[in-house]
């Protein structure tokens, strides 16, 4: 899936945070992906949900470097340990 909002270089202007939940594994156009990444490189934080982990397989590592991991497929479906590095941050405050 492609989203028209990402055609605008200023797509993230005015947002405090972006939640990525798109499922766009077949989108490979680097200018499009780079516009998404540029907003985050400029400081707009993001939360990336499940599908976003599998997106933008452009043949580069750009998306996966942004995520901090490379997801090439589903492994065993087991509980995932989560550690909150900033437990008082407003995004996660009160989470356990």
Say what each PLM segment does.
Residues 16-21:
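Structural motif
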Residues 1-15:
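Aromatic-Pro/Gly-enriched surface loop or interdomain linker
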Residues 25-95:
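A glycine-rich, often tryptophan-bearing local segment used as a flexible ligand/cofactor-contacting loop or short
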């Amino acid at each position: 899936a492609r989203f028209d909002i990402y055609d605008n270089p200023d797509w993230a202007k005015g947002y405090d945070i972006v939640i990525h939940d798109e499922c766009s594994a077949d989108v490979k156009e680097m200018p499009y992906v780079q516009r998404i990444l540029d907003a985050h490189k400029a400081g707009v934080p993001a939360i990336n949900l499940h599908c976003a982990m599998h997106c933008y397989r452009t043949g580069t590592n750009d998306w996966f470097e942004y995520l901090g991991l490379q997801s090439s497929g589903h492994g065993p479906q087991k509980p995932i340990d989560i550690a909150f590095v900033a437990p008082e941050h407003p995004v996660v405050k009160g989470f356990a």
